[in-house]
Amino acid sequence: MPLPESLRATPRGNASPPDTIDHTDADAVGRGVLTMMWTFDTTSDTAPFDASVRAAQTGWLTEAYAALLRTHRPRAVPGAQWQEWASHRAHTTVTLHKAEDAAKPADTATEAWRQWVVTATPHGRDHWTAEPVTALAYVRLIRKDTGTAWLVDRVLTR
């Protein structure tokens, strides 16, 4: 199924194009996916979830996770925060800080977990900036074998 026009747009922000990421580096793939999933642009996106659907098209996700994101429909319309951002024609810039947990499973040749604090700061085209939104993200990455590309299999946020 082709993406709607709004999801084919390139949002403003700091998401990296998929071909600029080292797919054999779990950190780089996780960082790239999280940055894309939190790069919103209210001039082309209808809701924050559109960024996750865009990420599903990059080739950075397992097919099962990409399919889940493409078919998921949020249960509610965007709220007051999104409406405020939209009134300023805002886009987000994303910063990530590793927040490794001692209880995190050790990497294996085919599975890695990463944890980041994600901060998305909305910037309006009218020079308005709002308080950043912060979340803790847990990313599970898998690959077929050593030396092959890492794929994000799951992102959990709190």
Feature map (PLM): residue ranges:
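Juxtamembrane and targeting peptides
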Residues: 1-44
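Structured, amphipathic secondary-structure segments that form assembly/contact surfaces
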Residues: 46-158
